[in-house]
């Protein structure tokens, strides 16, 4: 974190094999978002030293770190007040990020052009918490790093998780401990107007069709400690907008009487056929009203197309 270019690990190599040392090194890199951009890490052939190459010179690196730390303190001071529950803290942090950070699609496309191994200099900040918190734009790594720093400052136990999106594109998200239970939170994919907060406090099972974990983010032996098996604090459930499939059409119709756009949730494993059945019921009740609708991970969005 202090821009060290050489780290002596000889004391550890005497007691641990290289697999465990590599595992620990990967965890340290993943879970320390104040490390603002590493271009290369190498372990010496004799296993006694780690060499690190940074994207920025030491002066720039330290300046960016200071800016991030100051911004984190400023944000948390404005958001968190005494007596807030852990869930309340998480939700205000999450809301702040969705309102103040935009996804940097250009940075992602640039990384794709480089086989996802690097990005051109102009885009590199977007892969860090600096891009998210200072520049206001980032890709998933920046979102995940920013969430960790803010949640840490607010006193919430949390981690960054690495893996892929639907088994393809590399992706990063978070898990957070709320009242003793771990939950999946993906601010990047929640920052959308179509299916907002679809990945806010899900279980591993509910998120598994979209978020595929690898083992890079934490020491392998500890992965099970972060299992998310609970949905009590799932966003739509806590907001009173989660309904059984046999009730949801009625609820959508009721909300459409006073709203132009409705977002509600039902079973995460809802199929296309089940969604079509629900919408047939809604359209039958709405008569001639023209509707647009879609779903993702059980979140249904219905919009009145004729609304002015």
Predicted regions: what they are:
Residues 114-118, 127, 138, 149, ...:
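Extracytoplasmic/periplasmic C-terminal soluble domains
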Residues 129-143:
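A short, highly charged nucleic-acid-interacting micro-segment common to nuclease
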Residues 181-278, 292:
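His-Asp-centered catalytic microenvironments across diverse enzyme cores
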């Amino acid at each position: 974190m202090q821009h060290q270019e050489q780290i002596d690990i000889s004391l550890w190599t005497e007691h641990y094999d290289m697999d465990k040392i590599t595992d620990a090194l990967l965890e340290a890199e993943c879970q320390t978002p104040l490390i603002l951009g590493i271009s290369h890490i190498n372990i010496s052939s004799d296993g006694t030293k780690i060499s690190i190459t940074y994207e920025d010179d030491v002066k720039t690196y330290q300046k960016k770190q200071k800016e991030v730390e100051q911004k984190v303190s400023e944000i948390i001071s404005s958001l968190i007040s005494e007596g807030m529950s852990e869930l309340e803290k998480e939700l205000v942090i999450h809301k702040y990020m969705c309102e103040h950070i935009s996804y940097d699609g250009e940075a992602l496309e640039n990384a794709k052009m480089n086989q996802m191994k690097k990005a051109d200099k102009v885009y590199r900040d977007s892969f860090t918490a600096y891009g998210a918190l200072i520049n206001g734009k980032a890709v998933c790594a920046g979102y995940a790093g920013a969430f960790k720093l803010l949640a840490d400052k607010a006193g919430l136990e949390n981690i960054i998780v690495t893996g892929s999106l639907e088994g393809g594109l590399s992706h990063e998200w978070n898990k957070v401990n709320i009242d003793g239970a771990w939950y999946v939170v993906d601010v990047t994919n929640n920052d959308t107007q179509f299916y907002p907060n679809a990945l806010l406090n899900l279980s591993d099972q509910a998120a598994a069709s979209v978020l595929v974990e690898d083992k890079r983010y934490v020491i392998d032996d500890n992965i099970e400690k972060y299992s998310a098996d609970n949905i009590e604090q799932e966003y739509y459930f806590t907001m009173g907008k989660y309904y059984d499939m046999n009730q949801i059409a009625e609820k959508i119709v009721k909300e459409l009487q006073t709203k132009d756009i409705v977002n509600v949730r039902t079973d995460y494993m809802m199929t296309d056929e089940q969604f079509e059945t629900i919408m047939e019921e809604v359209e039958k009740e709405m008569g001639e009203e023209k509707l647009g609708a879609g779903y993702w991970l059980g979140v249904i969005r219905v919009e009145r197309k004729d609304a002015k």
